[in-house]
Amino acid sequence: LGYEEMTRANPDVDIWLPGAGAVVLLPTQFILPEAPRDGLVLNVAAMRLYYYAPEDQDGQTTLYTHPIGIGRVGWATPLGTTRITAKAANPAWYVPESIRKEHAEAGDPLPAVVPPGPDNPLGAHALRLAMPGYLIHGTNKPAGVGLRVSHGCIRLYPEDIASLYEMVPKGTPVHIVEQPYLAGWHGDRLMFSAHVPLEETGGDWLAALELIDRRVQDAPEGVGPVEIDWRRVARIAREGKGVAYPIEAGSPVPAAWRAASPLVRTEAVANYRPPEDEDVPEG
């Protein structure tokens, strides 16, 4: 899970120092964005990547998902359909002139090339897109995953990009979308989740209403007339927690839905430091 996913889902919890006995909601139920279900699909509003692996010999497709970091305000990750054109292990970072200029003006000059190693913002693996200058890559600052900190590239946790790098071949299609509002059927429950829209766009509330209407029309066989609790929809959208909740009238309210989630006790300690100023953001 990424930083924003955790903080939005747990607004009253210090994610880095939650305290002994704190109950933390892990938002691990994801609604798939509307996009072709082949190759890579990146929803920048949810800061999440999906990989639809090729069908196996039984005609089954395995879906993988990982949190991502995306471009900051002013350096937004571009939307659209592209493809993987090249793969590189232990890549050097050829710093774009625009980024070198920005850092020089801030009194923090960068070299023309950052060699592979622990100081390289690209991490140990990179997938080059057909969009000139843009990569899907690892990072030497994992705490930035789930934040808007890059110059437009997509960053993953080191362990996530390592596994993705092995699975994704050159030529794989990549669909980059911005869909803060998501809806889909989970059995006989119509689920809805809302993420905070990107600052530049502000989201499209009418599109959310139209999406829910389409999902109602596509109700699974055997599901009776569907009545939507529109007040609940509006509240979920307003809060923007990124957590999927049922929205039919009479279905469990969000608090009851959360209370029914299984509790898991863990003594694990986070390996990543809290995010600091990103002094060397990647391209």
Residue ranges and their predicted role:
Residues 1-3, 142-152:
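Short, basic/aromatic beta-hairpin or loop at an interaction surface
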Residues 2-39, 180:
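Extracellular LysM carbohydrate-binding repeats and other cell-envelope/extracellular binding modules
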Residues 30-142, 166, 194, 200-282:
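Gly/Pro-biased beta-strand-loop elements
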Residues 151-165:
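Short beta-strand-centered segments at strand-helix junctions
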